[in-house]
Structures are given as structure tokens and as C-alpha cells.
Amino acid sequence: DLDFHHYYGLTELLETWLKTQKYTIENEQDILALRKSFIDDNWEKVYDYTVTLCHNHHLRLHSIYGKRPKLITAEKQKRWVEKQRQKYGMVR
């Protein structure tokens, strides 16, 4: 089984962005209205800083960095994944 992982967790990223922009979300319409701006402002973190991992390594990553890793751990997560790939090879 393969899992998709964002080094910059979307929940943490969105919450930080909302605070920075001084936006509040009250309902689904608010989310839809802000979605494009959020993605435009965070394109790389949403789409480029991602990885596909086997399920076991994904669970291990979260056991180390937590269920909702802090944004400041993104580079550490990326290095950890690179080390795992050096040790175990790429998932095929």
C-alpha cells in the first residue's frame, strides 16, 4: 500500500495562512472563496513538497514527527525520507 504525504501538512499550513492573512472560516462558502488564494500563496508546499511512501514508512514518519507535524519539521521529514530511500531503496 502506498500513502501520499505532504511535508507541509495541509491543516497546519492552512491554519497558519489563515492567521497570517487574518481570515476566518465560518462555512463551506468561506473555504471555497479562499481556496485559490491559499493554493496560489502556497503552491510549492501544496504540490511540490510531497512524497509517496509505503504505508509502513508513512506510519514511522508520523510516529517520529507526530500525527500533525509542525511546519518547521518539513525539511527534517524530507531528510528522513531520503535516508530511508538510501537504506531501503525506492518503492516500486
Where are these regions (language model features)?
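Histidine-centered nuclease catalytic patch
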Residues: 1-49, 67
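Extended charged
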Residues: 29, 45-51, 55-92
